[in-house]
Amino acid sequence: IYASNQAQLPSTLPQGFEKVSLEAENLKEAMAEGGVYQLKEDADITGRSIEIPADMTATLDLNGNTITAANRATDGITVYGNLTLKDSKGKGRIVANKDWAGGAYGAGLIRIMGENAAMIMQGGTIYAARENAANEGQFGVAVYEGGDFTITGGKIEAGWSAVLGNGNFKTQNSVIRIE
């Protein structure tokens, strides 16, 4: 069942039904198609994979809303193309919903993957800090396999790494800029 945050649904759903955030589905579709998307309400994308394909350019405006995501390779936002993150209203956030738990929850909330992948952060907050940050911290943005990341505005708060970059012995030209 696709539901907006304003929807009135029973507290328990019949077997076989699942409540899915309509805003999360709209976000997923918009990022896959490229262009500009402005969040209309908070969205929980846990269990969903939001991807910007290699041949697409997308802009995500948090518009003062919150995206809740998991730090797993199968969740969160993965950029293979180009993403600009901004927040036109202020107080917009992307937040981690789980503590670090080894490899299962050990990726960035946003992952930039590949030589031609790039992200520019112009505003908003990526919040991956947890209550026990020293032992159960998380990662904000992960840059892999030659991806590029530029931050010109906003902030990243993380328990361990705000921006994480790892190579895998291939020729890579990752660039991380803080402007």
Q: PLM features: residue spans?
A:
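Acidic Gly/Asp/Thr-rich repetitive segments characteristic of extracellular carbohydrate-active
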Residues: 2-51
